[in-house]
């Protein structure tokens, strides 16, 4: 049994166009804010109530940064899987501050566009940067690249899933 689990799953809307920065060696880092809301009816008044939470998401995964940079805009609905990380920083007056963020890096991160891009089907992200079939895009870093080893979580093999019904054989294999 695992000693601990650090996994965050969010479905929400992007509050502003993502900010893309680059490290000194040119690798992209995407920052975005995701709003999640819950609604309920007040027991006493019957009035509909809503509470919105804002989440800071930081994407270090190079393949997912490309997806964010090209397709994610303000208002986009996203499904995100990542990890919580708290970082310490100092403000202008020298006081220590802490920020808790949802971080997407490595193999355990997912970013899926639920409302599509420009009216097409939803796009999915999972670390790599290749296109799949079936009316959606899937970026799957769990597949081996054509070079044999994975580099930076990128995949060179497109995932041809999504429309598997034409490949389905009706015969039972036993």
Swiss-Prot record:
InterPro entries per record: NA-bd_OB-fold (IPR012340), Primosome_PriB/ssb (IPR000424), ssDNA-bd (IPR011344)
Residue ranges occupied by any SSB domain in the UniProt entry: 5-111
Bias (Low complexity): 142-165
Keyword Kinase set for record: no
CDD domains (UniProt xref): SSB_OBF (cd04496)
Keyword Nucleotide-binding attached: no
Chain intervals for the UniProt region annotation (Disordered): 114-174
UniProt-listed GO biological process terms: DNA recombination; DNA repair; DNA replication
Record GO cellular component, one term: nucleoid
PROSITE patterns: SSB (PS50935)
GO MF, one annotated term: single-stranded DNA binding
Motif (Important for interaction with partner proteins): 169-174
Keywords: DNA damage, DNA recombination, DNA repair, DNA replication, DNA-binding
Ranges annotated as biased composition (Gly residues): 119-136
Pfam family, any one: SSB
Subunit-level organization: Homotetramer.
Xref: NCBIfam families: PRK06341.1, ssb
Function: Plays an important role in DNA replication, recombination and repair. Binds to ssDNA and to an array of partner proteins to recruit them to their sites of action during DNA metabolism.
Name used for this protein in its record: Single-stranded DNA-binding protein
Protein's organism: Rhizobium meliloti (strain 1021)
């Amino acid at each position: 049994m695992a000693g601990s689990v650090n996994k965050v799953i969010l479905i929400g809307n992007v509050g502003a166009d993502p900010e893309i920065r680059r490290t000194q060696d040119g690798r992209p880092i995407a920052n975005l804010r995701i709003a999640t809301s819950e609604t309920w009816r007040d027991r006493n008044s019957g009035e509909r109530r809503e509470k919105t939470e804002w989440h800071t998401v930081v994407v270090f995964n190079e393949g997912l940064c490309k997806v964010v940079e090209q397709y994610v805009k303000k208002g986009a609905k996203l499904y995100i899987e990542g990890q919580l990380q708290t970082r310490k920083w100092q403000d202008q007056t020298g006081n220590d501050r802490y920020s808790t963020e949802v971080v997407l890096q490595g193999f355990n991160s997912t970013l899926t566009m639920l409302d599509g891009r420009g009216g097409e089907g939803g796009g999915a992200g999972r670390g790599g940067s290749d296109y799949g079939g079936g009316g959606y895009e899937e970026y799957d870093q769990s597949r081996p690249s054509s070079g044999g080893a994975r580099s930076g979580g990128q995949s060179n093999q497109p995932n041809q899933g999504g429309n598997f019904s034409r490949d389905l054989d009706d015969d039972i294999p036993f």
